[in-house]
Structures are given as C-alpha cells and as structure tokens.
Amino acid sequence: MLFRLVFISFFLMSCSSLNNYTDDVRLNKLGLLEIETNKTYVSKLIEENIKNAFAIYKTKNSDEKKYTVILNVNDSIESSLLANSIRKIEMSINYKIIEKKSNIVLLNDSFSRNSLVGPINSLFARDQSEINARKRLGVSISNDMIVRLIEWASFDMET
C-alpha cells in the first residue's frame, strides 16, 4: 500500500514538472518590468507588493528594464446625506504595459474593486475605517495585478 502511494506521488510530481522550464523562461519577463505609479500611499503599496512578488525573476540582465508598467490608481467614496450611513469606497486602476525600445503599448486595461464601510459615529473611527478599507483594496488590487502580469508574461508572444 505504501509503495502505491509513493509511486503515485512520484508520478504526479514528474508530470507536474514537465512544463516548468518553458514557464520559467517566459516568466523571466517579469524581472524586466519597471513600474511607474502616481504618488499616493495606496499606489506605492501596490507597487511594492508587485516588486516583492517579482523579485524572484530578477536575473543578471534585469538591471536593464525592457518594459514599463504605468499604474494610475483612483479612489472615490460614495455616501448619502445621512451621517451614519453605509459608505462605499471604489478603487479603480488603469494600467499600461509599454515596451521601452519601440514605445509600443503591449497591453492597456482597467478594473475596479469596491468595499463597504459600515455606519460609525466617531469621526476618528470613520477615518481609520476608510484608511483600512483603502489598504485592503490596495492589497486586493495588487494581488489581481500580479495575476494579470503573470498571465501577460506567460502568453506566448515574442516581444
């Protein structure tokens, strides 16, 4: 019984490692990204999360950046006339991936995320709640951007 489990686990591990080399070659493009953002706290948080996620793809040639990712992060708060109403925070991001040599836009897209903040009486608590909601939205957007950039890099296109 133990032999069967060991055999099955080796078989599964070998099947899953067949495609890793080609993916690693394509994903090396992620080490060649330069990120530009607007100078808000949330956009800097998104930039740092993306840089930390792609630090493993840095190679000897990654000092020379081939691609520029331009991030434009905007947020808005919707509320009603009532002071203690539920507030909706919407954060949207527009991004472009540009090849530096030819200045060609390779990808241009946008998406948004929403968060609700409950009714709070204290002004300080309301501000803290909005700050925390913005941080959560920033982390959510950065995770989504990481996935989108990995999908872009793994797409089989010669650039």
Language model features with spans:
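Charge-dense, low-complexity intrinsically disordered segments
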Residues: 37-40, 44, 128, 132, ...
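C-terminal or internal capping secondary-structure element at the end of a domain, subdomain, or sheet
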Residues: 134-158
